[in-house]
Amino acid sequence: MKRKHLYDYVDLEGLHLKEIPDSIAMYACHGTYDIQTNKITSLKNAPSFVKGNFICDDNLLGLGTGLKYGPEEVQGTYNCSGNKLVSLDGIATLIGPRLTMDSNRLTSLKGLPASILNNNKSLSFNENRISSLEGYGFESVEFFEFFFSNNNVTLLRGGPNIVRTSYDCTSNPITSFEGGPTHVGRNFYAMGLKNLKSLKGLPSIIEGSLFISLMDMLRIFPDYTKNDRDIVMSTIRDICHVGGRIMID
């Protein structure tokens, strides 16, 4: 039978566990609950409520029952990265300031909890197989951070219009920045865009730095050479206010 509450930090990181032991089953954890870097395939015996962070990254949940049986409410960060997940079924309904689900096998964000669609939240789903940002309501939210590098996204349409800190669309097959954010409060990462054909839609305001690839710029501006970085930067500043540096790699 589950204990009702545990007022402590649960740290089971890196213990080679295949399951969460019955001996520590609980209803609520009033600290952080950390089971990262194990071989766990099921969240059975996890608490229903976590007041701190819920950290279950680098396990094998996608090969078992996924996020089912996990917490229903996490007031801190929810991190389920590196689990071979193919769906978000069973994810917590209420999540605090940040949801991180990098390095999985997600082709859709169906099931994304409505609680993450509130202003000033952070969402990261780098290294998945997402092909579209449309249909999730992102455009009506002012995210704190929005990261989706190394996916299959072809259009930025459907994503947030305003991001308060950083936005990362690196290594996606987009052809332009149309439909993307108009205002980025910190850094805009847009490197390794091998299909990029135009700077159209680049945010009108980037308060931090812009990170782009030299090869992408030379494709867009074929008359320039690798020695024309200053000209490329000047051209970009003519169409976009960049408060920090333009980093051309």
Where do the PLM segments sit?
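N-terminal capping/linker segments that flank leucine-rich repeat
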Residues: 1-24, 224-249
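Canonical leucine-rich repeat
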Residues: 20, 43-46, 63-70, 88, ...
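Concave beta-strand-loop units of leucine-rich repeat
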Residues: 12-16, 29-40, 49-62, 74-85, ...
